[in-house]
Regions:
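Short beta-rich binding modules
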Residues: 1-92
Length: 92
């Protein structure tokens, strides 16, 4: 699945391919639980426990303050994750 990866520590935003399953997302973000929040008609998938950890990196998107790494993915009418329609440049 096409996704945007936000690497909070290295302060980079890039287009990536990630398997459309939770374990792949956990591995890429570096977490055990994810939370999804709406953003620009897409979904920010981030570490649900990010604020409880000692992360020293984060970012803001719109009204959201995210601690740690995140993915931006799209969704289907059924609510499943899908390719993002945004570009990495749209996030920067």
């Amino acid at each position: 699945m096409n996704a945007i990866f936000i690497d909070a520590k290295n302060k980079t935003v890039s287009m990536i391919e990630v398997e459309n399953d939770l374990q792949s997302m956990y591995d890429k973000i570096g977490c055990l639980l994810v939370q999804t929040v709406p953003f620009a008609g897409e979904n920010i998938v981030c570490d649900e426990e990010g604020r409880l950890k000692r992360w020293t990196a984060g970012f803001e998107l719109g009204d959201w303050r995210i601690v740690g790494n995140a993915l931006i993915v799209g969704d289907t009418e059924d609510g499943d994750f899908a390719d993002t329609k945004l570009s990495a440049n749209a996030i920067m």
